[in-house]
Amino acid sequence: VRDGYIALPHNCAYGCLNNEYCNNLCTKDGAKIGYCNIVGKYGNACWCIQLPDNVPIRVPGRCHPA
């Protein structure tokens, strides 16, 4: 497990406006908790704590939306 910005396909972070959205998103995928990191490295994006290794996280490099 690890902490990180949960990722959409193509290395894009999930944008957010509130903690409830991120907590639901993160815990649905097995994380302990999640919150909306306001004005973080990737803008307002969901950060997950103790996210399972099989769930993709945002890594350095460009976001390539479909």
Curated annotation (Swiss-Prot):
Cystine crosslinks: 12-63, 16-36, 22-46, 26-48
GO molecular function, one term: toxin activity
Pfam families (alphabetical): Toxin_3 (PF00537)
Domain LCN-type CS-alpha/beta: 2-64
UniProt keyword Hydrolase, yes or no: no
PROSITE patterns in the cross-refs: LCN_CSAB (PS51863)
GO cellular component terms, semicolon-separated: extracellular region
Intracellular or extracellular location(s): Secreted
InterPro entries cross-referenced by the UniProt entry: LCN-type_CS_alpha_beta_dom, Scorpion_toxin-like, Scorpion_toxin-like_sf, Scorpion_toxinL, Scorpion_toxinL/defensin
Tissue-specific expression: Expressed by the venom gland.
Domain of life: Eukaryota
Keyword Disulfide bond: yes
Biological process annotations from GO: defense response
CDD domains given in the database record: neurotoxins_LC_scorpion (cd23106)
Keywords: Disulfide bond, Ion channel impairing toxin, Neurotoxin, Secreted, Toxin, Voltage-gated sodium channel impairing toxin
Function: Alpha toxins bind voltage-independently at site-3 of sodium channels (Nav) and inhibit the inactivation of the activated channels, thereby blocking neuronal transmission. This toxin is active on both mammals and insects. It can be considered as a cardiotoxin, as it can bind to human cardiac sodium channel and modify its normal properties.
Additional note from the record: Exists in two forms, due to cis-trans isomerization at 9-Pro-His-10.
Domain comment (free text): Has the structural arrangement of an alpha-helix connected to antiparallel beta-sheets by disulfide bonds (CS-alpha/beta).
Family (UniProt): Belongs to the long (4 C-C) scorpion toxin superfamily. Sodium channel inhibitor family. Alpha subfamily.
Full protein name: Alpha-like toxin BmK-M7
Native source species: Olivierus martensii (Manchurian scorpion)
